[in-house]
Amino acid sequence: MKKIILSLAALSMLAACHESLEDRCAREVKEYTEKKCPAMIAETVRIDSLGFDKDTHTVHYYYTLLGKADNAQVVAKSNPRKALIQEVKNATSMETFKEAGYNFSYTYWSESHKGLKLFETTINKKDYAK
């Protein structure tokens, strides 16, 4: 009887350790946001939070632009989508999620004009698998 109980306990612990990719992503996004956001990642860029939409398998990155970067014309001229696609292609930390075909969405807000969205794009498998 003792062996059966120990075996059942071991099996339940193994089952509890198995986490779906969606649950893992949701957990990691939440932990990152709670531990590291907001944070300056460059002189003119602050990461505010991350989010995850399980239905669309989309990881959302929310940023605020400050100073000289806080300008819609500057953002438009810099072609951020192209740079973000390259960043996703090169990001080894995203490999598991890229292999599963996840999407990566980026939203940049203005610091000086609250509520003004300066740029938004979603990078999907068609973009980063090229």
Please provide the spans of the model-predicted regions:
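Positively charged n-region of N-terminal signal peptides that target proteins for export
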Residues: 1-4
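C-terminal motif of bacterial Sec signal peptides marking the signal peptidase cleavage site
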Residues: 13-16
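Bacterial signal peptide processing site
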Residues: 18-20
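Post-signal peptide N-terminal segment of mature Sec-exported envelope proteins
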Residues: 26-46
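Short, non-transmembrane amphipathic alpha-helical segments
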Residues: 30, 71-97
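Short edge beta-strands and adjacent turn/loop segments
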Residues: 41-67
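A short amphipathic beta-strand at an alpha->beta junction
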Residues: 88-117
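Short, low-complexity, Pro/Ser/Thr/Gly-rich segments in the mature regions of secreted, periplasmic
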Residues: 117-130
